[in-house]
């Protein structure tokens, strides 16, 4: 699943390519994603102009004329593909947004876990009302993180992946951030010291920033709308490295399951 860095990259690309463009039409080839696509989507947004594009957590948000909000989530395998001119449609091209300059954005999702819905401004506020803090905000620091975690009895990795606490951090970046902070994913979130929270908040920001600079992590499905892939996977310390030597201490990387998810860490480096 694309996490914060990948969604940030896609949002920035779309901001550069389709902001201020007029939508000439929407073609829906498959209405039945995990949340059904808004039925009258073409009627609602055809002829309208995209005023802004932003990210909230792992969601891509298009602000359109008349307080219309197109909300997109890529699910497990979704992509937004930028195309010029007529394109042969592929099997999993579920939604095609066409623009007046003969370009288009194609929502392609083999596993159909993605989401494309229309909201108004009030619905947008309600939709994101219980989302947690954005990691790149100034407010997100050691003091904030310690206060956030002080009553959380779950393991720290699960806490980092809880969208109601902190948005955008999935399995990859939780594992990598914890390694950089030298904190074991087995630790109880509420037991972290202030210094550990300070270090963790810093390393979360550093890890996410480094991933964005590297174009994201391409393991299976992720690609930028241009078709370019990411390279941050080449910088992983622990994720996907089971039975391989730690880059820091040469100890073997361990794989366990936490809440049904794979967790990779170094027993020697992370305490």
From Swiss-Prot:
The keyword Zinc applies. Monomer. PROSITE patterns: FPG_CAT, ZF_FPG_1, ZF_FPG_2. This is Formamidopyrimidine-DNA glycosylase. It comes from Wolbachia sp. subsp. Brugia malayi (strain TRS). The keyword Zinc-finger applies. Keywords: DNA damage, DNA repair, DNA-binding, Glycosidase, Hydrolase, Lyase, Metal-binding, Multifunctional enzyme, Zinc, Zinc-finger. A zinc finger (FPG-type) spans 237-271. CDD domains: EcFpg-like_N. It catalyses: Hydrolysis of DNA containing ring-opened 7-methylguanine residues, releasing 2,6-diamino-4-hydroxy-5-(N-methyl)formamidopyrimidine; 2'-deoxyribonucleotide-(2'-deoxyribose 5'-phosphate)-2'-deoxyribonucleotide-DNA = a 3'-end 2'-deoxyribonucleotide-(2,3-dehydro-2,3-deoxyribose 5'-phosphate)-DNA + a 5'-end 5'-phospho-2'-deoxyribonucleoside-DNA + H(+). DNA binds at residues 92, 111, 152. InterPro entries: DNA_glyclase/AP_lyase_DNA-bd, DNA_glyclase_Znf_dom_DNA_BS, Formamido-pyr_DNA_Glyclase, FPG_cat, MutM-like_N-ter, Ribosomal_uS13-like_H2TH, Znf_DNA_glyclase/AP_lyase, Znf_FPG/IleRS. SUPFAM superfamilies: Glucocorticoid receptor-like (DNA-binding domain), N-terminal domain of MutM-like DNA repair proteins, S13-like H2TH domain. Binds 1 zinc ion per subunit. It comes from the Bacteria. Its cofactor is Zn(2+). Belongs to the FPG family. One of its GO terms (biological process) is base-excision repair. One of its GO terms (molecular function) is damaged DNA binding. Its EC number is 3.2.2.23, 4.2.99.18. Involved in base excision repair of DNA damaged by oxidation or by mutagenic agents. Acts as a DNA glycosylase that recognizes and removes damaged bases. Has a preference for oxidized purines, such as 7,8-dihydro-8-oxoguanine (8-oxoG). Has AP (apurinic/apyrimidinic) lyase activity and introduces nicks in the DNA strand. Cleaves the DNA backbone by beta-delta elimination to generate a single-strand break at the site of the removed base with both 3'- and 5'-phosphates. The active site is at residues 2-3, 58, 261.
């Amino acid at each position: 699943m694309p996490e914060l860095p990948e969604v940030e990259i896609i949002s920035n690309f779309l901001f550069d390519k389709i902001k201020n463009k007029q939508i000439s039409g929407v073609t829906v080839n498959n209405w039945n994603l995990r949340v059904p696509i808004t039925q009258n989507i073409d009627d609602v947004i055809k002829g309208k102009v995209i005023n802004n594009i932003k990210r909230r957590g792992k969601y891509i948000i298009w602000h359109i004329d008349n307080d219309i909000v197109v909300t997109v989530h890529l699910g497990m395998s979704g992509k937004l593909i930028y195309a010029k001119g007529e394109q042969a449609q592929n099997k999993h091209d579920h939604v095609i947004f066409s623009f007046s300059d003969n370009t288009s954005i194609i929502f392609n999702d083999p596993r159909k876990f993605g989401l494309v819905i229309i909201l108004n401004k009030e619905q947008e506020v309600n939709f994101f009302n219980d989302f947690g803090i954005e990691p790149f905000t100034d407010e997100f620091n050691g003091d904030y993180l310690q206060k956030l975690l002080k009553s959380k009895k779950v393991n720290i990795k699960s806490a980092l992946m809880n969208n109601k606490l902190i948005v955008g951090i999935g399995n990859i970046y939780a594992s990598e951030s914890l390694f950089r902070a030298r904190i074991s994913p087995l630790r109880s979130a509420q037991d972290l010291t202030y210094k550990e929270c300070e270090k963790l908040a810093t390393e979360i920001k550093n890890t996410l920033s480094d991933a964005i600079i590297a174009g994201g992590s391409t393991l299976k499905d992720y690609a930028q709308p241009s078709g370019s892939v990411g390279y941050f996977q080449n910088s992983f310390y622990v994720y996907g490295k089971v039975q391989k030597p730690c880059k820091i201490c040469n100890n073997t990387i361990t794989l366990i399951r936490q809440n049904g998810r794979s967790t990779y860490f170094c027993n020697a480096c992370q305490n």
